[in-house]
Amino acid sequence: MRELIPYFINGISVGGQYALIAIGYTLVYGILRLINFAHGDVFMVAGLVMVYTTTAMPFYLALPLVLIVTVVLGFLIERVAYKPLRTAPRMSVMISAIGVSYLIQNLAFYITGGVPQPVSNPIPWISENVAVLGTSTKRVTLVTPVLTIVLVVVLVYLINHTKIGMAMRAAAKDFETAQLMGIKINAVISMTFVIGSFLAAVGAMLYFTNYPSVAITSGGMPGLKAFVAAVFGGIGSIPGAVVGAFIIGLCEEVIKGLGYTTFSDAFTFALLIVVLCVKPTGLFGEKVTDKV
């Protein structure tokens, strides 16, 4: 059992990183009933921007720039790819999302030449090793779950106690009625993408601190697992996305600790199939009348 302690610690950290990505999926779905397939690629872009900026400028300038670039990217994706299709059939919007995903990957391929970019200048302090319960790990492993919980608390407060948050809840509850009540739907949707992109950028900086390089496909698997976490917890539910992410992160790492490393990824997608068969609404999800 003692041998599993490092895997439990890593699992909590990985779960926190998945949670930051999963919230982006669940926020967008809550309002637009859309799966933003480009969200994992936004996460990847944040990693690439971190690699380039941290080697070119001081960290106190580089890290805010990562957040700004990622947020602007998320905003532009919504305005260019989704806003013109607001009244279009949902399938058209989904196809647009897939197209945006491939566009971002190909632009990243053009910039990087398809070569993984090494994380040669990791974020100081959180990239240092520390001893925890008799095992050595990077400080980012401990920082990630704490920072995730803090950001989730701030987000929940924003949604429940601010005007923009109440507008987001109204739009999620009934999109058409919110429009008739005078809520600026376009501003609400843009803010949703901004928040999701911001959290994805934070998750990327934490995630890639533990990895030697960033490739154009680096957002694929974390994005898919975060999506599974959102579905498992109940897509559209922020607490559900967070709980689902931590459960998946812990299970994956414990499976690795038990010696079934090659099965850890398969477990996540097997879980998705089981959830969709047994409880399609997820742990905290609610039934909806509309169907895709």
Task: Describe the function of each predicted region.
Residues 47-52, 67-73, 100-108, 147-156, ...:
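Hydrophobic core segments of alpha-helical transmembrane domains in multi-pass membrane transport
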Residues 9, 31-76, 80, 85, ...:
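Membrane-embedded helix boundary and interhelical linker motif in transport proteins
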Residues 58-100, 107, 243-248, 279:
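Alpha-helical transmembrane segments within multi-pass membrane transporters and channels
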Residues 18-20, 57-68, 193-200, 206-270:
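Transmembrane alpha-helical segments in multi-pass inner-membrane proteins
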Residues 1-20, 49, 60-61, 88-93, ...:
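Membrane-interfacial amphipathic/re-entrant helices at transmembrane-helix boundaries
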Residues 84-85, 90-161, 188-191, 212, ...:
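Transmembrane helix-bundle core of multi-pass membrane transporters
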Residues 14, 133-214, 238-243:
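Helix-loop-helix "hairpin" substructures at the membrane interface of multi-pass membrane proteins
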Residues 16, 25-47, 87-92, 164-167, ...:
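Short, non-helical or kinked segments that cap or interrupt transmembrane helices
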